[in-house]
Amino acid sequence: MGILSVDLLITLQILPVFFSNCLFLALYDSVILLKHVVLLLSRSKSTRGQWRRMLTSEGMRCIWKSFLLDAYKQVKLGEDAPNSSVVHVSSPEGGDTSGNGAQEKTVDGTECHLLDFASPERPLVVNFGSATUPPFTNQLPAFSKLVEEFSSVADFLLVYIDEAHPSDGWAVPGDSSLFFEVKKHRNQEDRCAAAHQLLERFSLPPQCRVVADRMDNNANVAYGVAFERVCIVQRQKIAYLGGKGPFFYNLQEVRRWLEKNFSKRUKLD
């Protein structure tokens, strides 16, 4: 099958789910608009903020791009885990905690690879996301619990990627005080700074190490993240591959996988 035929087939596969996502956003905008009008008529103070739509031309481009990333991702369940280039993000305490609990001094922007954090004896849970992605940030407390409960048998890595909803792009509507306002990353320093902003609000356990994707977004592309995704690497292979976010981003599946494979060892520890 030729390249053009493959591209056409992928496009035809994407179109139905793309339009269903657009329909969902249109319904969401309609509900929010109705709520806004009701509050306006009642002269509520809640209407002071500017109403912004989710279904915009910028939003549609982002959604389409996310499906392309998912369709062309390199990562496959049971196959070799892509060893993407990333950079260290130092913890608020000024260090990086290794898998054995020791503090290691790291500097923002120090180059490394994703599989540098993988151990032959322990699975590596990799969580991809950004501060401007509400489904990702809403699940960070649950992710922190996973780290605390299973750090004796597994390693954890958070990979900070391109912003899902930058303030100068497809911004999230609503009360800005509830969300992060981060602009599109112009350089690696911007991306590391955004990761620090996330860590300042969400205190992750020291056992979870944090890195940022390179500006070429190679980790995002290899793992087909787009907005958020979680996977588990074991012996350099993909042992678990979570679905495409936001609708199929599911940390409960990660918990079930860890409980199935390591619950007895956790109880002994």
From Swiss-Prot:
InterPro entries tied to this protein: Iodothyronine_deiodinase, Iodothyronine_deiodinase_AS, Thioredoxin-like_sf
Classification of source organism: Eukaryota, Metazoa, Chordata, Craniata, Vertebrata
Descriptive protein name: Type II iodothyronine deiodinase
Gene3D superfamilies xrefs: Glutaredoxin
Tissue: Highly expressed in thyroid, mammary and pituitary glands, then in hypothalamus. Low levels detected in diaphragm, heart, kidney and lung.
Keyword field: Endoplasmic reticulum, Membrane, Oxidoreductase, Selenocysteine, Thyroid hormones biosynthesis, Transmembrane, Transmembrane helix, Ubl conjugation
Chain spans, region Disordered: 83-103
Membrane topology summary: Single-pass type III membrane protein
Organism listed in the record: Bos taurus
